[in-house]
Amino acid sequence: MASQGTKRSYEQMETDGERQNATEIRASVGKMIDGIGRFYIQMCTELKLSDYEGRLIQNSLTIERMVLSAFDERRNRYLEEHPSAGKDPKKTGGPIYRRVDGKWMRELILYDKEEIRRIWRQANNGDDATRGLTHMMIWHSNLNDATYQRTRALVRTGMDPRMCSLMQGSTLPRRSGAAGAAVKGVGTMVMELIRMIKRGINDRNFWRGENGRKTRSAYERMCNILKGKFQTAAQRAMMDQVRESRNPGNAEIEDLIFSARSALILRGSVAHKSCLPACVYGPAVSSGYDFEKEGYSLVGIDPFKLLQNSQVYSLIRPNENPAHKSQLVWMACHSAAFEDLRLFSFIRGTKVCPRGKLSTRGVQIASNENMDTMESSTLELRSRYWAIRTRSGGNTNQQRASAGQISVQPTFSVQRNLPFEKSTVMAAFTGNTEGRTSDMRAEIIRMMEGAKPEEVSFRGRGVFELSDEKATNPIVPSFDMSNEGSYFFGDNAEEYDN
């Protein structure tokens, strides 16, 4: 964890964590991408998909989900032990869409998990290649972040729906490892901890016995991950308090919610990575591109260049706008769901709409949707500029933000002011500064009140032309400060239901 003095780059977390130089990191991330690409090509061959069908993002999602399910040890064990009617624990599958006589047809496929594992390992030189699996999990998580608002989940844990900018990675599975922990937002970590504490309150044995010891160490580990995301001493001290509590209860929940709210202004460090669907890596590999040899980075120009030269298609429902569908997927590809709209409009080079104004539902098609009226179209995933992804929250300051989302979590390391609604955030801090953490609370509130509207974050950082691979000439964009900054503004996005 960052605070433990073991600052490893996120690429190192994706690799084996050995200290590597940039070239080695690029090669090993490239190797991971190669493996995903080779696996995808093989699956398309198995399923006899045409080139067009193989580039359909819905088919990609099904194939990705199958391999993730095949390697989900815990769930597989659970399914073996609790057999449910009509579910074969040894099989996995999903909808595959094919073009037949000028129409899209849905076919439900079923495969042995063992067979899928074999194909995956074969594509990855015999390894389990957990990093490749995590990479796909993060892509699914980024897609969920761009598509759904987690209002219900926030309210259930006693948090406020306006804190949605803190919820990056809230749908990532537990098994996503260090790379997964790096991309989780402050709100996501707080929510996981609150759920844990609530179980402890309701179940006397939760913290006891052999299992309780494991639970306790998981709790402390999560506290440390969250602590590592905070950038101020007072917020970190507060996390120490929560972690050291002998019997975590309502006081800890209060402290956690307080620290989450404070992160709207005193932002945490959250990593951002451009994770693309497997149907982007597959065709690139089959065209002869060698990712391991060329090297690849998830936080630099590489994903932008790859998307410039990729054709990805999507099924479109009758009343959906293909441009809006493209925006949704573009945001997911760059992990930009909580980024400032003004900024990624600039990078993408097209006007970007807030979620509530998008005429598009999620990318996945439900099994009961009528296929007769489905069309397909090309997703426009190209960009005008590229920018380096950030893993810090940027320094903090104010500007008017909106009724829905009241803060941003920056994705790109580009100079701008960071909008949030100070009066709204501060209103949440009335009263309660007593108790064990009162001095920390007072200190945090003081820092928040001192945050200034005119401060600029990521000073001097800019976007780059796509021809500028070495990032030599930063272009610092200028923004209309009066413009709306947040994506979930006054929103009607669907809820995420597992």
Swiss-Prot record:
Post-translational events: Late in virus-infected cells, may be cleaved from a 56-kDa protein to a 53-kDa protein by a cellular caspase. This cleavage might be a marker for the onset of apoptosis in infected cells or have a specific function in virus host interaction.
Pfam families attached to this UniProt entry: Flu_NP
Keyword S-adenosyl-L-methionine among UniProt keywords: no
Motif interval(s): Unconventional nuclear localization signal: 1-18
InterPro entries with a match to the protein in the record: Flu_NP
Localization terms from the record: Virion; Host nucleus
Motif Bipartite nuclear localization signal in this chain: 198-216
Region of interest (Disordered), residue spans: 1-21
Keywords: Capsid protein, Helical capsid protein, Host nucleus, Host-virus interaction, Ribonucleoprotein, RNA-binding, Viral nucleoprotein, Viral penetration into host nucleus, Virion, Virus entry into host cell
Molecular functions per Gene Ontology: RNA binding; structural molecule activity
GO cellular component terms given for this protein: helical viral capsid; host cell; host cell nucleus; ribonucleoprotein complex; viral nucleocapsid
Compositional bias ranges of the Basic and acidic residues kind: 8-21
SUPFAM superfamilies: flu NP-like
Complex and partners: Homomultimerizes to form the nucleocapsid. May bind host exportin-1/XPO1. Binds to viral genomic RNA. Protein-RNA contacts are mediated by a combination of electrostatic interactions between positively charged residues and the phosphate backbone and planar interactions between aromatic side chains and bases.
Function: Encapsidates the negative strand viral RNA, protecting it from nucleases. The encapsidated genomic RNA is termed the ribonucleoprotein (RNP) and serves as template for transcription and replication. The RNP needs to be localized in the host nucleus to start an infectious cycle, but is too large to diffuse through the nuclear pore complex. NP comprises at least 2 nuclear localization signals that are responsible for the active RNP import into the nucleus through cellular importin alpha/beta pathway.
Name of the protein in question: Nucleoprotein
Gene: NP
